[in-house]
Amino acid sequence: MYDTNSSNKVIKFISQYYYTYDHFLITDPDSSDYLYNFSSKNELLEITPPEQDEEHLWKGIEFLKELLLDFYSTDFIKSHFPYSIILVDEMADPVFGLPANCYTGRYFCCVTIQDMDNMSPEEKAFYSAELHEAIWFQIGLYEENFLDLPDGFFTIS
């Protein structure tokens, strides 16, 4: 599966992502990628896998890079990003059942790529903020002492 010399740019990027970050970028998800997710069962999360067209997937990868990955260093992604990022065409939030752009669990982050071509710059900025918020929420929730603030930070001035 992993081939950093592949002529298929999607397979090549997925391979490079794995070897660079020791994490997975999943473009053809099935329920085993998010349902049990190592520690808990996410049986309410509903996704529609992305269309398995190389150009569609490549645009999704570029979208992910532009809105999220390019903001962080290799070391940061290796140390703090979820074990897998899962690209999907559609997703329903497991709490409210409404369409969602992204969803994180302890070891994964699902990112929708279906309507990426139709987004205005403002919508892209909002989507990017949602992705960053989801990643930082996941980091804050699951990593002890990630952000070590001095006691003085909490005093009211």
Positions of PLM-derived features:
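Auxiliary, metal-adjacent structural segments of Zn-dependent hydrolase domains
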Residues: E54-Y107
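Proline-rich intrinsically disordered, low-complexity coils
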Residues: P29, P49-P50, P82, P99, ...
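Pocket-edge structural micro-motifs
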Residues: F38, D89, I113
